[in-house]
């Protein structure tokens, strides 16, 4: 047979010793086991020197001149049989690059010799593994589907997905075109283009993919590990070496430093080692403090709620802090459906438990899991109270919106003790609200805050009168709903008792207590009035705290040292002054002038004198 290329090179195969080239028998090759061959793609340049004829010409010496032709092969194909041992065919396949997998096929899509000029190109399939597909029959190409290919190779092609055909690096095995063009030739081209990409994907699928390790983000507050003595020496000498050799690379500098370190004396090395030991001790101390701080921090968990109730106010990211007061063994988690009380760390430690539907429409509810060291003592003294924290920015920035959409839903069976705390100062400043600093308590409760009142519950209302402001209290059965109304012009509230007045100040909420036997303005019972801080907007339900100590009647008028302005712009604390306060450290940014400071101090002093005097009522103009 003649190969294209101009030289008459013939390769003959004769004799019965090669039954695998017989058309009547099945093609068997030695099994290579389960080994996988990873043969990289070999792209051929368009060079005539790499033609098949030149490659096959090297095998001319291996031909058997005395052998006779195989009758069965000649009868079917009308050509001399080819003597291509399997090893040679494999080598030819690797050089030709037609098929790159050890267990696939090799095609020679040229017209081989003049005897084949009238026939379609002969394709010889030489399987290299245990594939049982025989030779092609009567000029037809033997095709291998994906399932058969995967079963023979012992690999999976990704669940039967058909891979897209990829363009092979070479379009043809040789630059000499075939004189015949047919559908078989197109099929050979498509099949050969698919094989390199399929084999590559198969090999990759066989390997185990390692899951990428996720690196934890470093905390900037975490102390840094100390460096070694050599690293300290490297830092000291690197700048000097760079100054002498500006063009030196990092590797060259490292070599110079290493040689200098080796030649360094033991005493000089000990200096750097002592520095390292000291740095290690400092690092261990800082690391222990850092870990303790991490353990003490509250773990905040966000629980998604069912979006059943509509929300009128969008919920900003939750923020809440609880100040550490004294260690107490407890853990606080909010009830699933009681979402609103503001817990803050600016005033004394209060414990609170209030249910409100105002924040129920928000998509998030914040759970605080607080360690023993962070719990204030007043929390453990509560009667099983649970604290739900809502974002502080909702209270400050939304103003009365939260209060108007909220109603108290505490059941009578619940033992509810409601104590309020001031809102975070940072959130109040961000919301441009007036952050009023409370003066130290001088036997008067903190200022009162405005809240809307539902008409269904009994209330204690503070009515405003021209000079004094007296508290008119109605007799509720057991619990008192306090609704505090404040008029736009801030007024001074004074305490005016009739015979005697018993004022009690406690460390937790400041209260004004009275006797249950002597009513306050026709009130048959006495109640504990807990006043909110100026920045807190919430409704309170307080338990009745009777006290049988004072035998005489009395009228109680609450004294407010700093009335709260509802406008977002802060005003002077003095009663009746509408001017904005001036920034001053001495006044705590609460007064507009020295005159207002003097007048306000006089008013507070006169109110205190009035509370001491049991027989006279002092009115301050």
Curated annotation (Swiss-Prot):
The alphabetized UniProt keywords are:
Chromosome, DNA-binding, Methylation, Nucleus, Phosphoprotein, Transcription, Transcription regulation
Renumbered to this chain, the Low complexity biased-composition regions fall at 320-333
- Residues recorded as bearing Phosphoserine in the entry: 178, 181-182, 315, 533, 550, 552, 560, 562, 567
Return the PROSITE patterns for the record. HMG_BOX_2
Indicate where the modification Phosphothreonine is found in the sequence.
Answer: 176, 313
Biased composition, class Basic and acidic residues, residue ranges = 183-193
| Description of how activity is regulated | In liver, recruited to target gene promoters following treatment with dexamethasone and cAMP. Binding is decreased in presence of insulin.
Q: What is its main location?
A: nucleus
Listed SMART domains: HMG (SM00398)
Superkingdom to which the source organism belongs:
Eukaryota
Bias category Basic residues: which stretches?
Answer: 208-218
What is the protein's known function? Answer: Transcription factor that modulates cell fate reprogramming from the somatic state to the pluripotent and neuronal fate. In liver, controls the expression of hormone-regulated gluconeogenic genes such as G6PC1 and PCK1. This regulation is independent of the insulin receptor activation. Also acts as a regulatory component of protein phosphatase 1 (PP1) complexes. Component of the PNUTS-PP1 protein phosphatase complex, a PP1 complex that regulates RNA polymerase II transcription pause-release.
Assembly mode: Component of the PNUTS-PP1 phosphatase complex, composed of PPP1R10/PNUTS, TOX4, WDR82 and PPP1CA or PPP1CB or PPP1CC. Interacts with PPP1R10/PNUTS. Interacts with FOXO1 and CREB1 (increased by cAMP); FOXO1 and CREB1 are required for full induction of TOX4-dependent activity and the interactions are inhibited by insulin.
| Record-given protein name | TOX high mobility group box family member 4
């Amino acid at each position: 047979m003649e190969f294209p290329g101009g030289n008459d090179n013939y390769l003959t195969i004769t004799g019965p010793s090669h039954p695998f080239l017989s058309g009547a028998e099945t093609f068997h090759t030695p099994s290579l086991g389960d080994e996988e061959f990873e043969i990289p793609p070999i792209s051929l340049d368009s060079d005539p020197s790499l033609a098949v004829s030149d490659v096959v010409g090297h095998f001319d010496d291996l031909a058997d001149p005395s052998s006779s032709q195989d009758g069965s092969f000649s009868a079917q194909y009308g050509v001399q049989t080819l003597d291509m041992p399997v090893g040679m065919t494999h080598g030819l396949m690797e050089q030709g690059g037609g098929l790159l997998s050890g267990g696939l096929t090799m095609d020679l899509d040229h017209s081989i010799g003049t005897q084949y000029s009238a026939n379609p190109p002969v394709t010889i399939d030489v399987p290299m593994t245990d594939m049982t597909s025989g030779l092609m029959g009567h000029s037809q190409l033997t095709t291998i589907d994906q399932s058969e290919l995967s079963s023979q190779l012992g690999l999976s092609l990704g669940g039967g997905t058909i891979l897209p055909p990829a363009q092979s690096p070479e379009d043809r095995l040789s630059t000499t075109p075939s004189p015949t063009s047919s559908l078989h030739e197109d099929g050979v081209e498509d099949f050969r283009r698919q094989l390199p990409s399929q084999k590559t994907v198969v090999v990759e699928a066989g390997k185990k993919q390692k899951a990428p390790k996720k690196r934890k983000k470093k905390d900037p507050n975490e102390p840094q590990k100390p460096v070694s003595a050599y690293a300290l020496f490297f830092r000291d000498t690197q700048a000097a070496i760079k100054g002498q050799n500006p063009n030196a690379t990092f590797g060259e500098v490292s070599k110079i430093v290493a040689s200098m370190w080796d030649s360094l004396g033991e005493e000089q090395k000990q200096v750097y080692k002592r520095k390292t030991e000291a740095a290690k001790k400092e690092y261990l101390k800082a690391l222990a403090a850092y870990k303790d701080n991490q353990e003490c921090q509250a773990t905040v968990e966000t629980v998604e709620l069912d979006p059943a109730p509509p929300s009128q106010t969008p919920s900003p990211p939750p923020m809440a802090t609880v100040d550490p007061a004294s260690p107490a063994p407890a853990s606080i988690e909010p009830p699933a459906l009681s979402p609103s009380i503001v817990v803050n760390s600016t005033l004394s430690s209060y414990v609170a438990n209030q249910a409100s539907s105002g924040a129920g429409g928000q998509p998030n509810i914040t759970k605080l899991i607080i360690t023993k060291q962070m719990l204030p003592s007043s929390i453990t003294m509560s009667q099983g109270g649970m604290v739900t924290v809502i974002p502080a920015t909702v209270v400050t920035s939304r103003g009365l919106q939260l209060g108007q959409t909220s109603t108290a839903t505490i059941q009578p069976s619940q033992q509810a003790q409601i104590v309020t705390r001031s809102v975070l100062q940072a959130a109040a400043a961000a919301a441009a609200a007036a952050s009023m600093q409370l003066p130290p308590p001088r036997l008067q409760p903190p200022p009162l805050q405005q809240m809307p009142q539902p008409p269904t519950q009994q209330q204690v209302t503070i009515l405003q009168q021209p000079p004094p402001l007296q508290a008119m209290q109605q007799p509720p059965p057991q619990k008192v709903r306090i609704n505090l109304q404040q008029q736009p012009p801030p007024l001074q509230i004074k305490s005016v008792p009739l015979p005697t007045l018993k004022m009690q100040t406690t460390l937790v909420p400041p209260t004004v207590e009275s006797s249950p036997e002597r009513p306050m303005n026709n009130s048959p019972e006495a109640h504990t009035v807990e006043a909110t801080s100026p920045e807190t907007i919430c409704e309170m339900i307080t338990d009745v705290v009777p006290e049988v100590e004072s035998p005489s009647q009395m009228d109680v008028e609450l004294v407010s040292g700093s009335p709260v302005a509802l406008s977002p712009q802060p005003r002077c604390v003095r009663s009746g002054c509408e001017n904005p306060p001036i920034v001053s450290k001495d006044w705590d940014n609460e007064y507009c002038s020295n005159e207002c400071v003097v007048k306000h101090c006089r008013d507070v002093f006169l109110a205190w004198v009035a509370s001491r005097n049991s027989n006279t009522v002092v009115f301050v103009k």
